[in-house]
C-alpha cells in the first residue's frame, strides 16, 4: 500500500470533519501497521546568515525520504504548496505529499505530490 492509498483508506474509514491531528494520528497507525519507518513532528530549522532564526515542524517524514504535510481545509492552495516546497528545501529531500482531508460530505481526499 502506498501513501496515496493509505490516505484514501483513512478518509474512507474516518470520513470528513476531523482536525488535521486526527488524520495525522491515523496515518501514524497505518504506517506502523505496515511496518513503514517514519518520524513524526520533526523540527526543521530555518537558517539565515549562519543563524537559526526559526523552525518548521514537518508532520511526518517517511523512510527518511518523503515529507507528508496534512491539512483539513476546503481545498489545497498556493500557501500550502509553498509550505511543502519549503520543507523540501530545508530538509534536502526530494518528495513531499500535501494531503488534504476536506470537511463536508461528498468530498474526496486531495493529494498533491511535489518534487524538488
Residue ranges and their predicted role:
Residues 15, 58-76, 87:
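Conserved catalytic cores of phosphodiester-cleaving nucleases, focusing on short active-site segments
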Residues 18, 22, 51-55, 75-78, ...:
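Residues at secondary-structure transition points
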Residues 71-116:
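Nucleic-acid nuclease catalytic cores
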Residues 34-50:
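A short acidic/basic microdomain associated with nuclease active sites
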Residues 1-37, 95, 107-108, 112-116:
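Solvent-exposed, charged helical/coil patches
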Residues 48-51, 106-108:
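Acidic pyrophosphate-coordinating catalytic loop
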